[in-house]
Amino acid sequence: MSNIYNIEILQIIDSVAREKGISKEILISTVEQAVQVAGRKKYGNEYNIKAQINRKTGEINLLRILKIVEDVEDYLTQISLEDALVKNPEAKIGDEIYEYLPPIDHARVSAQAAKQVITQRVIEAEREKQYHDFKDRKGDIINGIVKRIEYGDIIVDLSRAEAIIKKDQLIKGEHFKPNDRIKAYVQDVRQETKGPQIFLSRVDNQMLVKLFKLEVPEILEDIIQIKSVARDPGSKAKIAVFASDSSIDPVGSCVGIRGNRVKAVTNELNGEKIDIVLWSNDLAQFIVNSLIPLAPSEITKILIDEDSHKVEVVVSQEHQSIAIGRRGQNVRLASKLTGWNIDIMTEEQESKRRNEEFSTSTELFMEALDVEEVIGQLLSVTGFNSVEQIASSEISTLTRIEGFEEELAVEIKNRAIHYVDLKNEKIIKKLEELGVEQELIDILELPLELILKFAEYGIKTIEDLGEMSVNEFKNLAPNSNITDENIKLLIKTARHHGELKDS
């Protein structure tokens, strides 16, 4: 039997469902749960109680659920088949029997349910809806209105939700005030207890990529590809582009007529100057292109060291400052763009460095291999700069050196191997004395000299490695050819290993 309170509940539910865009069924189920709680408080928690609301009349009924069993152990929640057949001739073991319970004060309970539970469920449902609306927007550019500023963080009104731009995700020097329009990149969407958290950024590299996609149709259509990006947000950026169709000028397409396309991106990013660089699978050419505004003709020489993942670019004295850029910005961005550590040197500096390296390696070979100066010089001028390189080289490589017959080549190689073995034995002994775990040596896969350096710094176990930062790792192994991503993976693996040990 329905009454005015029951009808009022349905009206409240209808109104909230329409206004908030929440399923009517979800709200009714929520009220039913509240009534069930009230029923258990009155009749006892030991009862299995269910509330039902008639979707048309709003009538509320309380029912006790009894499970049909062969042997009744709990008379509050179970019923025998014999007793169940009296109530329902078609009853069988495993079914449930519903018994109506005397009504409680539905008017009071209904009002409380409408006021408290619906409100809470609306909040939860809105949070769920916001999360589902925005979780697929991760990686998009989004527009909003600055709602307020809290300790430097910007709270952005997205109409159906709020987002946050942390202070460190804002471009340095830009200022926003309430009601300003703002465009940002959706960096992450997380479901948390207090609701969905939408994190925006204006400094993420992908912000630049997405803006170019908006301005350059050829990028959106994948005719032009963005290969890599490097940014000093708000100051300068470099973006490497490529088109497989040789008839298309990817750089010109991104710049636009009279620079209109790149200017649009620059204006959005608080005046960030952008160099459009032509990508090439020829590393030397890509390095040359990346150093714009330095002209290719102003580069004298490029020396690529694959072992240390370094590139030396030799220029004249007058062009060095252009190549390096203000406070090293140009070469730093070029290094990030290409993924190689680029060092700019003048012709004089390069000549001096080569002479110093030649002298150093010659002296090393004379002492380590017990050879005359002329042999040390021949090894140095051939390109060897460590005893390890000689030890691992082929005899045929050594015999190509002028004056090196096979007998001499074999002797030099054997002396190099002996030197390296003795050196490694000393390092291994030192590592043992320091208590370095073999697992750490295995996972690092670095020369023993570097591992000793790690150990002397205090990194002796995989757990120690897991507590390192990428910068710490790079400072200890500056000349290793391990990329930042692989360093992160090493540290992550070490942390996971430590967690498994603790569990």
From Swiss-Prot:
Ranges for the S1 motif domain?
139-203
User: Which keywords does the record carry?
Assistant: Cytoplasm, RNA-binding, Transcription, Transcription antitermination, Transcription regulation, Transcription termination
Query: Which InterPro entries does this entry report, sorted A to Z?
Result: DNA_repair_Rad51/TF_NusA_a-hlx (IPR010995), KH_dom (IPR004087), KH_dom-like_a/b (IPR015946), KH_dom_NusA-like (IPR025249), KH_sf_prok-type (IPR009019), NA-bd_OB-fold (IPR012340), NusA_bac (IPR030842), NusA_N_sf (IPR036555)
Tell me yes or no: is Protease among this UniProt entry's keywords: no
Chief subcellular site? cytoplasm
Mind telling me which GO cellular component terms the entry cites?
cytosol
Question: Which CDD domains does UniProt cross-reference here?
Answer: KH-II_NusA_rpt1 (cd02134), KH-II_NusA_rpt2 (cd22529), S1_NusA (cd04455)
Top-level taxonomic group: Bacteria
The protein's location, in the record's own words, is: Cytoplasm
Q: Where is the KH domain?
A: 308-378
Q: Output the PROSITE patterns linked to this UniProt entry.
A: KH_TYPE_1, S1
Give the record's GO biological process terms: DNA-templated transcription termination; transcription antitermination
- Quaternary state and interactors: Monomer. Binds directly to the core enzyme of the DNA-dependent RNA polymerase and to nascent RNA.
Q: What is this protein called?
A: Transcription termination/antitermination protein NusA
